[in-house]
Amino acid sequence: MRENALELHGVCKKYGGFALRNVGFTLPRGTVMGLIGENGAGKTTTIKAVLDLIRPDSGEITVLGEHGSNPSVREKIGVVLENGGFPSAMNAVQVDTLLGRAYRNWDTAQFFRYIERFGIDKEKAIKDYSKGMKTKLNIAAALSHDAELLLLDEPTSGLDPVVRDEVLDLLYDFMQDENHAILLSSHITSDLDKIADEITFIHKGEVLLSEPRDELLDTCGILRCTADQLDALDPSAVRAKRVGTFGCEALVRRDGVPENWPVEPVNIEQIMLFLTRGEDAR
């Protein structure tokens, strides 16, 4: 059995009117987990809790077998936060100097290989970068200190498709080492279709599902039916539903639906929309 790179058990944190409620999931080494949910669902808060940037009110978080505040563990985590980054007056040369002091395993040669690959002018101030260039710089930094776990908060948000594919290629290369793992928060579900092994869905601070992606897509589907047909199903077969004037549609478990009923394939985006906007049928 593979070791877990990340474990969360019963994590709770209250922020005024928002709260993480009993958040729990495990991320094995050798795995890319997509963390999905609408804006404000708790994705960034969860990542900050893993990084020990905020302290949960209760619960337990284990990172690479230890507590996330352990300095030796922090050395092994590569981080890209959506609204994070380096001072805008700095350039890539200064970023290299800064991070060379911060990380024992900082690899200057590796960092500048990424800078060259990305076509970044190492003397240019970050304030003059495009959004895509800033993201590439942050990812280059995350990949240049021998990290084992990447925590990425919306790393492809706002990027054009070509740059997004380039970023995903880098993550794919990182995962060639089966000791590595990635937690990737994103609302761009097409990216997760390409790279994610597992999907964790968080809604209003609560994890509604955490399952292997292929298993989720293979076992679930969309059923369009009448209200009477929906009522005839075992409730355990219906994960979420929408009831309208002219009929119903439901996110269902295929093995709980009669074989002669047409169940359409489903993708990650549709699952997220059903669980966010549909009526919970648990």
Q: What spans do the regions from the language model cover?
A:
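ABC transporter nucleotide-binding domains
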Residues: E3-L183, T189-S190, K194-H203
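Non-catalytic surface loops within mature trypsin-like serine protease
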Residues: R29, A227, R254-G256
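Short loop/turn segments at beta->alpha junctions
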Residues: N91, P212, E264-N267
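Exposed alpha-helical structural elements
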Residues: Q110-R113, Q229-A232, N267, I271
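Residues that form generic nucleotide/phosphate-binding pockets
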Residues: Y114-R117, L170, T219, I271-L275
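Short, surface-exposed beta-strand/loop "edge" segments at domain boundaries and coil↔beta transitions
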Residues: L150-P155, Q229-L233, G256-N260
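ABC transporter nucleotide-binding domain
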Residues: L168-V252
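C-terminal coupling/interaction segments
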Residues: V238-R282
